[in-house]
């Protein structure tokens, strides 16, 4: 009897310990939520976590003591959580995940353990409940891999014809396929009926290794049967489009300075196919000494144009991969001429990462400058060169507009002016090139900026192609101290005017998620723009504009202000941590000025819309775009509080910029949870279509 009784007690304890363990875990979860909830409520946040945490703490204790009341209390808390979650975020799938998924998992485990509670005589009901909850978990797991929040088109668009890029042909000779930057391939061999059957045709490996400094961001060119690619270190490779076999490789021998190695695109120039070349006095001597080869079949009859990360402009024979030595000095133009100081301790603060713009027999280039270094950085000057000789044709220096070519001997182009690091578009008929400008260095501070250059910051600027003189400017951010510079290439499109004609339009995407629709003849908005008041709090020594432009006549993507309810996590805990972090931040919307208190930027300096730009199906009048929804946190720190010798000399998130010549350095990082996941709820980007004729979001 004694042995049997002991065995029975041992068996009972073995059956009880899983419930006791579950109760203890539930109590710990409740304690953490309650403590975090107290902190959140003290910051003005939701009281839910205090109440739910306390309830789970008590329920866990009761379950550990084998009290049925613990199960009932847990169930009531779960039901209350469902009501709270639906009230806070509705039926938004991704927002419901961290609110309900943990309860679903806990409820499933509890259902399996219910038979261990006194008074629960049947296993059938608990196991049936566990089965239902288990199916819910499986369904939720499947739903994670399904699209959510999809907006579908009501009907197929009416096909129309558009002449903005007529006669471009089947090649991809420009970074955005066309001079208008439409980057849409109107081909039909790949279509919705067979896209799922595509297989890899060939693979080519460049031999370069991606590291912290290098990223492969190239959009290849395709001319006839050849694909032209450039690598982060500016190697140019010609490949057979059919089989991927290398035809030639050109290495310009740039130094890997481990900073910001990119080559986003190339230019293509074929002199014999330029029907109406521009006539420049600078080229007369060159043309007399370089008679055209019959039929354009001589050396360098077709040329690849490249800018490099050591600030050179090169031309390469598209057939052989050899330098075109009659261009510039032995095939190269030194782009540092007239720029003043550009080399700082073997780190270049000026070079080029985007594709050069080839307009007939001209090459137009801007330049990349190192973000956040100083108030004294290289110029954002725009220059045009002869595509034949490499001679400088004109320069546009917004700080010294009287300089139309090289600056006076001993001088330089205006320092730290807004640059054009992205890609322009151009309209040959109107004779205009459209520049997407950056904001003036050092990005997050503007107390020193002169009025002469302020108006060109974060703007679309139209220049006369022949002279480089400004024709019009439209600014998308006033006094930009958020790094909301224009990264996307302008896209040109002719909008039907309803009277049988068209209006030449320019579509400009911005990092703010705003889409501006402008008349490309004069910069006048074609879709309504409102100037809205914005927060006026700013660090001492700087200022903010009273209003900012909002393109209310076009859809905006990802531009809604964040709230505490938008905070996300994979679990209870990281969502709560993000809610607490959000409440601690300085945030009054997208134009909250950087301050000495950590400040939330959203949409951040990644966008909205970045340099990937948009595509336009001109026959249907559809604008295709994808946005980024990743917030950042920035903090101004007085120089006196920083050991500047230990600053992280980076270019992206997670680094500190010295901003020499200002009162502060700027620290910036991603707004992530403790698990390294963005604190805002998915989606972290969408792909969408906008009807440019109705100006409505289609899908």
Q: For each of these PLM feature ranges, what is it?
A:
Residues 2-155:
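Topology signature of small-to-medium multi-pass alpha-helical membrane proteins
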Residues 140-169, 191-195, 204, 223, ...:
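N-terminal amphipathic, basic-rich helices that act as targeting or association modules
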Residues 140-186, 545-571, 651-655:
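N-terminal pre-domain segments of enzymes
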Residues 172-176, 213-233, 260-312, 348-374, ...:
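Repeat-blade elements of multi-bladed beta-propeller folds
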Residues 179-186, 208-213, 237, 443-444, ...:
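Short, solvent-exposed loop/turn elements at domain surfaces
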Residues 185-195, 200-228, 252-253, 281, ...:
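Asp/Glu-centered strand-loop micro-motifs enriched in Gly/Pro and often flanked by an aromatic residue
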Residues 194-207, 236-260, 268-280, 313-347, ...:
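Extracytoplasmic/lumenal domain signature
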Residues 425, 548, 552-632, 640-641, ...:
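Long, low-complexity segments enriched in small/aliphatic residues
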């Amino acid at each position: 009897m004694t042995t049997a009784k002991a065995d029975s007690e041992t068996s009972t304890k073995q059956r009880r310990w899983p419930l006791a363990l579950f109760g203890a875990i539930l109590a710990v979860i409740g304690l953490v939520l309650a403590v975090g909830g107290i902190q959140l409520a003290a910051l003005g946040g939701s009281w839910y976590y205090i109440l739910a945490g306390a309830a789970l703490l008590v329920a866990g204790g009761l379950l550990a003591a084998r009290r049925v009341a613990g199960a009932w209390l847990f169930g009531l808390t779960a039901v209350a959580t469902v009501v709270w979650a639906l009230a806070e975020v509705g039926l938004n799938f991704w927002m419901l995940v961290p609110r309900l998924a943990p309860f679903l998992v806990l409820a499933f485990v509890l259902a399996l353990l219910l038979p261990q509670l006194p008074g629960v005589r049947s296993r059938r009901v608990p196991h049936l409940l566990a089965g239902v909850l288990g199916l819910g978990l499986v369904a939720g797991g499947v739903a994670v891999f399904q699209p959510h929040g999809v907006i579908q088109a009501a009907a197929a668009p009416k096909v129309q014809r558009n002449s903005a890029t007529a006669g471009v042909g089947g090649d991809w000779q420009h970074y955005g396929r066309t001079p208008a930057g439409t980057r849409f391939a109107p081909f039909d061999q790949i279509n919705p009926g067979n896209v799922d059957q595509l297989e890899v045709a060939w693979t080519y490996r460049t031999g370069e290794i991606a590291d912290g400094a290098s990223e492969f961001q190239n959009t290849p060119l395709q001319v006839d049967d050849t694909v032209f690619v450039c690598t982060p270190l500016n190697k140019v490779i010609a490949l057979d489009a059919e089989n991927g076999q290398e035809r030639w490789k050109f290495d310009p021998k740039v130094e890997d300075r481990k900073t910001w190695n990119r080559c986003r695109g190339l230019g293509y120039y074929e002199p014999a196919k330029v029907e109406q070349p521009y006539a420049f006095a600078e080229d007369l001597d060159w043309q007399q000494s370089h008679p055209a080869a019959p039929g354009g079949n001589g050396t360098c009859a077709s040329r690849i144009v490249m800018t490099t990360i050591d600030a050179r402009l090169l031309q390469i024979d598209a057939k052989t991969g050899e330098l075109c030595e009659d261009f510039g000095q032995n095939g190269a133009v030194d782009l540092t001429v007239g720029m003043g100081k550009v080399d700082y301790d073997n780190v270049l603060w000026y070079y080029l990462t985007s594709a050069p713009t080839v307009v007939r027999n001209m090459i137009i280039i801007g330049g990349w400058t190192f973000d956040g270094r100083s108030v004294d950085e290289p110029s954002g000057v725009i220059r045009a060169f002869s595509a034949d000789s490499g001679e400088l044709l004109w320069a546009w220096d917004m700080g010294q507009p009287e300089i139309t070519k090289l600056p006076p001997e001993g001088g330089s182009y205006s320092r730290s002016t807004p640059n054009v690091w992205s890609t322009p578009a151009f309209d040959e008929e109107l004779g205009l090139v459209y520049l997407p400008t950056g904001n003036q260095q050092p990005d997050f501070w503007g107390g020193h900026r002169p009025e002469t250059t302020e108006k060109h910051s974060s703007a679309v600027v139209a220049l006369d192609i022949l002279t480089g003189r400004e024709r019009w400017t439209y600014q998308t951010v006033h006094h930009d101290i958020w790094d909301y510079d224009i990264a996307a290439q302008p896209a040109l499109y002719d909008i039907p005017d309803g009277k049988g004609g068209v209006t030449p339009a320019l579509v400009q995407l911005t990092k703010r998620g705003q889409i501006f629709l402008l008349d490309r003849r004069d910069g006048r908005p074609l879709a309504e723009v409102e100037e809205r008041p914005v927060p006026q709090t700013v660090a001492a020594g700087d200022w903010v504009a009273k209003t900012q432009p909002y393109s209310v006549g076009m859809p905006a993507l990802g531009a809604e202000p964040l709230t505490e309810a938008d905070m996300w996590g994979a679990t209870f805990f990281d969502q709560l941590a993000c809610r607490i972090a959000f409440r601690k931040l300085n945030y009054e919307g997208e134009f909250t000025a950087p301050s000495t208190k950590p400040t939330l930027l959203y949409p951040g300096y990644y966008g909205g819309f970045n340099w990937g730009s948009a595509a336009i199906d001109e026959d249907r009048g559809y604008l295709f775009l994808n946005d980024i929804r990743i917030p950042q946190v920035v903090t101004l720190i007085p120089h006196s509080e920083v050991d500047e010798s230990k600053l992280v000399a980076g270019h992206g998130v997670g680094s500190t910029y010295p901003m020499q010549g200002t009162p502060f350095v700027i620290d910036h990082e991603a707004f992530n949870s403790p698990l390294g996941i963005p604190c805002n709820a998915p989606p972290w980007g969408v792909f969408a279509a906008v009807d440019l004729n109705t100006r409505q979001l289609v899908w």
